[in-house]
């Protein structure tokens, strides 16, 4: 096979596969070698694109869990091709981005083919900035910055100052350094190791959480309802009794409110019990001027009906948001018939205390949550429905929740239909409240905090310009 350094195609495939293993699994242990291989291909746009293709196809392989889609009205013969097409489209999008980045790299090199460190730094900064911009778009889930967790919490501590974009930039620089060491057969590796150790030491020191104001005890309901069965007549009949049971369990746990996951309450839901045993904070659906929205709703014992707190802003393409296509072409693409986005702000300034909300996919938008924290959010809530996807997506989701906790210095309560239901402390430590796929109610005691992190201040200063 020869020396790996002389095999660009092999390096592209191997690097992409290593990168794909990083999010939620191997972290920097596989990402840094993957980035070193990418730097070795930086002047080969097609090979760099191949790196991106394989990286995203492997890291996003959970998308194949969409199949079968027959419950959404799609013919059985078309279900697998549609799931594969969605999966491949994500890989192709990543390949195009890597192609553009490689073309930019060609413009940055010297005429003699060598590299200034300033050019390397510029390319790393462009990558980090691109991840920050993309995380607010509907076409991004997890990148190099988010791949640090759950494996390397000390390094992720730097996210308290730099955010996910800064973590991505640092890893790009270390990847370049690792490639230089490889080229030189390991000579002059001291500076590389020292920078790595210093970053980990600084990150570990930064993990100290802001001081807590008071504790908040909340219940978390994980109903574990398979999405493919959720809208069946039998499940609809059983829903109200299941919710009533969860509310009674929450009352026995002496919590201030019960939190239920994304999409739990149907449109125009009314409680059977009057009054409710405890307040209910739940995902659900509502209509606003003829537009359907996925929302977080609050039902209180002393008030009739439900109060909308925040609407989902960042919608999943096709799964939630549908383009204006003829009705026959949208069949089988969305279980909810197409949603409209709400306001971009994630800040909720109501009972029980000011907090910020990320509904499912929105957990990848760190800037929005940092901005909400700067507006006064004292804790973060994320609700989701990750069924029917496999456990890999839950691990990636929880890794992003850890990163958001570290960036903002806030405790994060995650409540999901089939998991992960967990409490993430402001220092990124995770307390699993319930096992995946388990129908149960658990209590979580989180801490309310007000002191801002450097990253939240930076995001607020930038957004206020």
From Swiss-Prot:
Keyword Transmembrane: yes
Keyword vocabulary terms for this entry: Acyltransferase, Cell inner membrane, Cell membrane, Membrane, Transferase, Transmembrane, Transmembrane helix
TM region positions: 12-32, 49-69, 80-100, 122-142, 161-181, 189-209
CC terms in the record's Gene Ontology section: plasma membrane
KW Protein biosynthesis (keyword) present: no
Localization of this protein: Cell inner membrane
Domain CN hydrolase: 221-448
GO MF, any single term: N-acyltransferase activity
Chief place of localization: membrane
Biochemical pathway: Protein modification; lipoprotein biosynthesis (N-acyl transfer)
CDD domains: ALP_N-acyl_transferase
EC number: 2.3.1.269
Residues of the active site: 262, 312, 360
Function field: Catalyzes the phospholipid dependent N-acylation of the N-terminal cysteine of apolipoprotein, the last step in lipoprotein maturation.
Name of this chain's protein: Apolipoprotein N-acyltransferase
Organism: Parasynechococcus marenigrum (strain WH8102)
